[in-house]
Amino acid sequence: MDKLQYELQGYLEIDRYRKQRFLYPLLFREYIYALAHDHGLNSSIFYEPTENLGYDNDNKSSSLIVKRLITRLHQQNHLTISVNDSRFVGPNRSFYSQTIPEGFAGIMEIPFSVRLVSSLERERIAKYHNLRSIHSIFPFLEDKLSHLYYVSDILIPYPIHLEILLQTLRTRIRDAPSLHLLRCFLHEHHNWNSLITSTSNKSISIFSKENQRLFLFLYNSHVYECESVLVFLRKQSSHLRSISSLAFLERTHFYGKIKHLVVTPRNDSQRTLPLWFFKEPLMHYVRYQGKSIMASRCTNLLMKKWKYYLVNFWQCHFHLWSQPGRIHINELSNHSFYFLGYLLGVRLTPWVIRSQMLENSFMIDTAIKRFDTIVPIFPLIGSLVKAKFCNVSGYPISKSVWADSSDSDIIARFGWICRNLSHYHSGSSKKHSLCRIKYILRLSCARTLARKHKSTVRAICKRLGSKLLEEFLTEEHEIVSFIFRRTRLRSERIWYLDIIRIHGLVPHS
């Protein structure tokens, strides 16, 4: 990590430019685009391999071409749009529409990356790379939700206009030329309208693969500002003390976790503030992408007040119309909610305890709250239907588009999907739903092979034998079986710290 900081501070001269709050000259540094093409930073904890984001490493960066493109961009007149405008047609347009945003996003990420590294080192968090894992959220929920009463399911609204994003960035980036360049680029980008007006899909997948790095940075900045309502409420709520508050910024998917928010009693000089701020209880907040949850031990009335705060703050501060229906408040003991591909809830498990005192014995009926993580079988089957592995009834069908591949390739593809789904849903408290998904994939694989060889499923299974079955067994299943007994393995929740993204078949929106 010291090496990473040395690269950021020395190689990019970040200290000098950060003091001057002037980032625009960095766009004319050729090494910026080398770093944007996975020549330095992408090996750190903040980034994913560039092949996952569609970058073309064969595209050579030239500072002279970049300067020419920036000059042309500034000379364009956005009041008149011509269909025959060919100034950015062909290879130059491809270079312009991808390279400049890559460099701009890389420059904008530098201060956040340095700030995150210093924050983690200051907090002395060991193995903080494990915090990138999506599964790191669930132990937190497992430890806290079973003691809470109400949960609020929130969808963060999207910006309705690009100027809102630019105004948001202006509060943190005071470099006018850089913001002007960003505004020009956003006016040019043909996918921007679909980015900010899409209502059919609220997940982050609406971003185009082209320039995904820049759009993810803008989206993260927008969400970060939307969450600033928590800071606003902290100031309004007197001594609202944050025990642990860390923001994890990543280029792909990132989430902010505020572990505890505690309100302590106010002093006499603050009695003029509203009465209902006096005893606001513990509030927990977790977010992934555009969906977040807030849970608390407070009453339904206080949860409605938090909902009122959020809706009005977003509307007044960001001019975002957030429908109240996007924030659902439910009682945890009677409601389950979808989050990160799991159906989460709190279940009351009855227990009978026998107590004996001297010669008298007592039978005490009690109930223990248990945090449930269930694999949502119907949404998963719906994903399999869209991928054409089964029909709407869950009956396995052949994957016809894979029938031209070799037998080993077909088996490997199905096995890879099955292992990834099993790996991600290893934290499920009930594994029988996952067994059904495995059965659908295994039989779909057999039907695909049978279609290729114009044979029957029984003949294929008899010919391949154990080879077909072994491909669908996860490697960690064999390792974990040595730790837990077979009877406990079906009920034990196992969270892995190497999962940094959700599989495409997992319904998480």
UniProtKB/Swiss-Prot annotation:
<keyword id="KW-0934">Plastid</keyword>
<comment type="function">
    <text>Usually encoded in the trnK tRNA gene intron. Probably assists in splicing its own and other chloroplast group II introns.</text>
</comment>
<keyword id="KW-0694">RNA-binding</keyword>
<dbReference type="GO" id="GO:0003723">
    <property type="term" value="F:RNA binding"/>
</dbReference>
<dbReference type="GO" id="GO:0006397">
    <property type="term" value="P:mRNA processing"/>
</dbReference>
<dbReference type="InterPro" id="IPR024937">
    <property type="entry name" value="Domain_X"/>
</dbReference>
<comment type="similarity">
    <text>Belongs to the intron maturase 2 family. MatK subfamily.</text>
</comment>
<dbReference type="Pfam" id="PF01824">
    <property type="entry name" value="MatK_N"/>
</dbReference>
<dbReference type="GO" id="GO:0009507">
    <property type="term" value="C:chloroplast"/>
</dbReference>
<keyword id="KW-0819">tRNA processing</keyword>
<keyword id="KW-0150">Chloroplast</keyword>
<keyword id="KW-0507">mRNA processing</keyword>
<protein>
    <recommendedName>
        <fullName>Maturase K</fullName>
    </recommendedName>
</protein>
<dbReference type="GO" id="GO:0008380">
    <property type="term" value="P:RNA splicing"/>
</dbReference>
<dbReference type="Pfam" id="PF01348">
    <property type="entry name" value="Intron_maturas2"/>
</dbReference>
<dbReference type="InterPro" id="IPR002866">
    <property type="entry name" value="Maturase_MatK"/>
</dbReference>
<dbReference type="GO" id="GO:0008033">
    <property type="term" value="P:tRNA processing"/>
</dbReference>
<dbReference type="InterPro" id="IPR024942">
    <property type="entry name" value="Maturase_MatK_N"/>
</dbReference>
